[in-house]
Amino acid sequence: MSLDIQSLDIQCEELSDARWAELLPLLQQCQVVRLDDCGLTEARCKDISSALRVNPALAELNLRSNELGDVGVHCVLQGLQSPSCKIQKLSLQNCCLTGAGCGVLSSTLRTLPTLQELHLSDNLLGDAGLQLLCEGLLDPQCRLEKLQLEYCNLSAASCKPLASVLRAKPDFKELTVSNNDINEAGVRVLCQGLKDSPCQLEALKLESCGVTSDNCRDLCGIVASKASLRELALGSNKLGDVGMAELCPGLLHPSSRLRTLWIWECGITAKGCGDLCRVLRAKESLKELSLAGNELGDEGARLLCETLLEPGCQLESLWVKSCSFTAACCSHFSSVLAQNKFLLELQISNNRLEDAGVQELCQGLGQPGSVLRVLWLADCDVSDSSCSSLAATLLANHSLRELDLSNNCLGDAGILQLVESVRQPGCLLEQLVLYDIYWSEEMEDRLQALEKDKPSLRVIS
């Protein structure tokens, strides 16, 4: 292996002693070191620590999904305390770190003024560990900008020290506390901290945190006051239509420049969708929206599609998987696919579109004005009857690059029609996803031959 490289990136590999000895010189000189799920032991952590002490070039260290434990993490952190260390990004996600190990981590943060990103998700830090961590984050020498704390066993009690960090750190840009039971009280404390903070927050992720409709008024104020905010993730919280009505005035505020909004599985219906459509019409900045897992129904689909045809809506990615759509709404989506010049990605899987609905979509995709690049139609009750329309569309459409038809009953007859179109030079598809579809050995041979004959295409199954 050449030693003249900038990055060492190894994933899911059990490292033998010989292989490890080969890698050690690289640890001493690479700018980026990623050893993801490599079965690292405490002894290996000592080797890593020694190597890091003599590597002033290190900018990123990723040790995620290794059972380092508090002792192993301590060893690694000792290596980062060299005066020459200039690390910017550290990931210890899923490393069996506990609250007891947060004291050492807190002390280390005081000595790493260059560290900008810290990933600690999937470690059981608890409230006591988070308190220790925040003491380090509050040190004037710590200039952290991005902190990920997903699945860290935090409660509302952790939100007070986090809010103190937000108030004290003007450089803070991204906070992820998803999948922690901070609940309504904790979210309110965080929002107050953000309200009082001079930080230019760019991303706030609170998915599956027990956010309620009452919190949406607090969040509305944050969205309205933080012009820097670009991403808000609130998925898997019980916001409901009432919460959407509270949140939307903030999204409509003139200073709001939100780009990405994730509100999947939030109990939103067509009524809440109507409020959201006002935002889509008014905010050209909003580019990515996930409404997956909300019972929007065909009425919600109609409202969305009418909005997508408005000149003020410049959405590029729409996720409406599992939204209780039927074939009845597909004529609306077909119009969007034919006329909208901004929508590049549509995730509409797990809706009962059936053959009639997919054939409607194909009519829109086949129009010269279609710009869609990625389409997910997995688990949409599609049969081989739709494959002739899909096959013709793949030849007529020159923008589509990815198509997912997984978990549909296409069979050999349907797959053959797709293969015959995809193999043509005029078809520009780059990725065809066919999980959970059953075909014969003969068809398997055809698919393998297709990939061999057309290297630009990947068939994923």
Swiss-Prot record:
Signal peptide: none
Annotated SMART domains: LRR_CC, LRR_RI
SUPFAM superfamilies tied to this protein: RNI-like (SSF52047)
Molecular function via GO: ribonuclease inhibitor activity
Modification type Phosphoserine: residues: S91
InterPro entries the UniProt entry points to: Leu-rich_rpt, Leu-rich_rpt_Cys-con_subtyp, LRR_dom_sf, LRR_RI_cap, NLRP_innate_immun_reg
GO CC annotation: angiogenin-PRI complex; cytoplasm; cytosol; lamellipodium; nucleoplasm; nucleus; plasma membrane
UniProt modified residues of type N-acetylserine: S2
Domain of life per record: Eukaryota
GO terms of biological process kind: cell migration; regulation of angiogenesis; regulation of Arp2/3 complex-mediated actin nucleation; tRNA stabilization
Keywords, ordered alphabetically: Acetylation, Cytoplasm, Leucine-rich repeat, Nucleus, Phosphoprotein, Repeat
Chief place of localization: cytoplasm
Pfam families referenced in this protein's UniProt entry, alphabetically: LRR_6, LRR_RI_capping
Subunit composition and interactions: Forms high-affinity heterodimers with RNASE1, ANG and RNASE2.
Region spans: 2 X 5 AA tandem repeats of S-L-D-I-Q: 2-11
Compartments in which it is found: Cytoplasm; Nucleus
Record organism: Pan troglodytes
Function summary: Ribonuclease inhibitor which inhibits RNASE1, RNASE2 and angiogenin (ANG). May play a role in redox homeostasis. Required to inhibit the cytotoxic tRNA ribonuclease activity of ANG in the cytoplasm in absence of stress. Relocates to the nucleus in response to stress, relieving inhibition of ANG in the cytoplasm, and inhibiting the angiogenic activity of ANG in the nucleus.
Comment block on domains: The LRR domain forms a horseshoe-shaped structure that interacts tightly with target RNases via a large protein interaction surface on its interior side.
Name of the featured protein: Ribonuclease inhibitor
LRR repeats: 20-48, 49-76, 77-105, 106-133, 134-162, 163-190, 191-219, 220-247, 248-276, 277-304, 305-333, 334-361, 362-390, 391-418, 419-447
PANTHER family: NACHT, LRR AND PYD DOMAINS-CONTAINING PROTEIN 12, NACHT, LRR AND PYD DOMAINS-CONTAINING PROTEIN 3
